[in-house]
């Protein structure tokens, strides 16, 4: 999601909160989903080591596709990389590859450039939980939301890329320049994993269940395209996306040309899926299923690393973290700092939760607002977006969910548990290899004052988070809207 759209989404949420449209937490039984089971598979897993390679792998897979490409994403940008990948998908469809894209509708308006592609006989695009408002911008969208919040609050947050049912990419990335290090303004530090093996069949079934459900509709039912103008809007957008971007396109092709064979690790992989019943009862199917499976695989962990862009507990209860601490586990949290967060709402609530976590002796690493990644094409500011949990440096969760109420109760998510010490060590290295350059270590000094330390730098005030933020943070807290975050 681009920064401009994130800001606009915040405006929409603000309007909804101001009008009093905040849902309450559902009643959840203590043993909810405790009996849910998933099948463990042997698979080959490859942690894609850089952001540019994550995009290059997708292009390479599309060019090699022979039969089918299935995808699910929360957002797909109309920018250089977003349009480049769509064009590659169109070329695959020209070779008789069946292309299916399920896309959340929150950020799709009257985007004829996208609906254009659905005219191709081998391309189908469906929108999840679509809005009625398409042409009135965010004001119309916000009004639509405020009058039908119970339905429209649920969003599709999965990120899924499957080629020929043989190769699959999962992780936290949506599709756009800023997810792969190619934005000139700001980028996300994120993660993707490439899979091969029998586990993909389970994701095939999950994809088909959503594709066939009442919750998705063909894009051209909502965005009308004239047959005589076939591909005109897409071609125009593609030309605009390429304009003055020759160096970026050349660099992407160079990345593809120099791709090595993936260094796969053999591992036991267990898929975790959400339930579409969540759209009716808002219960935390995915969160509970994931935690139950973790307990089965690691009953008494001694160490846990939790990586999430947003750390907002459900109903102010850190149930998962408290359970770890009760078992004497050392808990490390890696998340955004107040200044590095791409959400205008999260810092307002995270401020108090930081203190609670420090009270629990959680080790906290906060991402710097001016963090620069050496593998990004443009060395600009970045936002932390990695979503993973690692138990005992052995069992690793990789998926689409954040550590917040929205992922628990409102969004549809997916993920996997990977049982492999070698893979877990790779993930920890991936997250922390630039530790001093990218993170503040947050703790309390002897007097009890909160401090942020990085190398020889010591801060006693929230780094790069000015007093100008205090008023909006106060207003956001008064709205009591954590359930929506």
Explain the meaning of each model-derived region.
Residues 2-10:
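Bacterial N-terminal signal peptides that target proteins for export
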Residues 9-19:
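Bacterial N-terminal signal peptides
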Residues 21-126, 130-156, 163-485:
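Charged, low-complexity intrinsically disordered terminal segments
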């Amino acid at each position: 999601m681009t920064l401009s759209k994130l800001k606009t989404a915040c405006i929409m949420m603000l309007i909804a909160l101001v009008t009093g449209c905040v849902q309450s937490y559902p009643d959840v039984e203590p043993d909810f989903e405790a009996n849910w089971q998933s099948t463990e598979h042997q698979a080959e897993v490859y942690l894609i080591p850089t952001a540019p390679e994550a995009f290059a792998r997708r292009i390479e897979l599309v060019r090699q596709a022979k039969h089918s490409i299935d995808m699910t994403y929360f957002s797909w940008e109309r920018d250089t990389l977003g349009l480049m990948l769509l064009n590659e998908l169109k070329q695959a469809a020209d070779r008789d590859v069946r292309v299916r894209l399920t896309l959340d509708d929150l950020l799709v308006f009257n985007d004829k450039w996208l609906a254009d592609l659905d005219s191709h006989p081998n391309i189908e695009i469906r929108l999840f939980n679509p809005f009625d408002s398409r042409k009135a911008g965010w004001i119309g969208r916000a009004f639509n939301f405020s009058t039908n919040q119970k339905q429209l609050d649920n969003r599709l947050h999965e990120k899924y890329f499957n080629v020929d049912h043989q190769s699959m990419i999962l992780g936290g990335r949506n599709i756009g320049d800023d997810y792969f290090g190619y934005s000139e303004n700001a980028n996300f530090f994120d993660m993707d994993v490439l899979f091969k093996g029998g586990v993909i069949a389970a994701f095939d079934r999950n994809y088909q269940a959503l594709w066939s459900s009442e919750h998705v509709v063909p894009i051209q039912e909502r965005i009308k395209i004239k047959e005589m103008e076939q591909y005109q809007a897409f071609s125009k957008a593609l030309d605009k996306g390429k304009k003055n971007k020759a160096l970026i396109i050349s660099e992407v092709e160079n990345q593809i040309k120099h791709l090595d064979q993936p260094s796969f690790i053999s591992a036991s992989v267990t898929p975790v899926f959400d339930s579409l019943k969540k759209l009716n009862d808002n219960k935390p199917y995915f969160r509970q299923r994931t935690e139950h499976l973790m307990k089965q695989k690691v009953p008494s962990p001694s160490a846990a690393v939790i990586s999430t862009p947003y750390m907002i507990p459900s109903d102010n209860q850190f149930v998962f973290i408290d359970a770890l601490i009760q078992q004497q586990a050392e808990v490390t949290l890696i998340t955004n700092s107040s200044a590095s967060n791409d959400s205008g709402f999260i810092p307002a609530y995270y401020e108090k939760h930081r203190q609670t976590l420090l009270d629990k002796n959680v080790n906290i690493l906060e991402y710097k607002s001016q963090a620069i990644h050496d593998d990004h094409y443009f060395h600009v500011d970045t936002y932390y977006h990695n979503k993973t949990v690692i138990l005992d440096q052995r069992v690793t969760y990789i998926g689409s969910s954040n550590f917040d109420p929205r992922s628990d109760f409102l969004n549809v998510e997916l993920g996997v548990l990977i049982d492999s010490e070698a893979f877990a060590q790779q993930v920890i290295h991936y997250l922390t290899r630039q530790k001093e350059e990218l993170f503040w270590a947050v703790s309390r000094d002897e007097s009890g004052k909160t401090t942020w330390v990085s190398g020889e730098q010591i801060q006693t005030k929230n780094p790069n988070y000015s007093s100008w933020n205090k008023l909006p943070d106060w207003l956001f807290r008064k709205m009591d809207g954590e359930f929506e975050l």
